[in-house]
């Protein structure tokens, strides 16, 4: 029963995640990328304020610093994602955003000197093929939206990497 609920939960999260790209694409018809970002972060701030109100008084200086750094990485990822979506398709935007997962081990290798394993290399090579198939045009150039979206993936990859580092240093 727990496994079935877990699978259902993953399917629901996947639908919501994928639907977000289409919803953002539709929103871009009426709003600028930074208007979308403003609404997104305003709603998130209000919800976090409601749910974390009791914990706000106990936040340490380190948590504020780490949270700010993570916020910059996260904001960069979202901003570049929305800007990229303005110039590419929702499907390209979603796939290229998801390449952040294979970027994290390389960031860990470059910054933290963490050794790469075979799965990291094979996964990255496979993702690179997917990026090429989706993004390369007939003259082997890559579209503006796809470039923005790849940088968005880097922002999210840094956020994931730094969350792992900072999470070990605070409560």
Residue spans for each PLM region:
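Small-residue-rich packing faces within the transmembrane alpha-helices of Major Facilitator Superfamily
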Residues: 18, 38, 42-46, 128-129, ...
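Hydrophobic core positions of alpha-helical segments in small-molecule transporters
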Residues: 39-40, 70, 96-99, 119-122, ...
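Specific transmembrane alpha-helical segments of multi-pass solute transporters/efflux pumps
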Residues: 20-21, 49-97, 133
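C-terminal transmembrane-helix exit sites in multi-pass transporters
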Residues: 47-56, 100-122
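Glycine-/small-residue-enriched transmembrane alpha-helix faces in small-molecule transporters
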Residues: 1-35, 140-165
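Hydrophobic transmembrane alpha-helices of multi-pass small-molecule transport proteins
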Residues: 48, 68-70, 116-136, 152-156
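Structural signal for membrane-spanning alpha-helices in multi-pass inner-membrane proteins
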Residues: 14, 48-52, 78-81, 108, ...
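Hydrophobic/aromatic residues within transmembrane alpha-helices
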Residues: 27, 36, 40, 84, ...
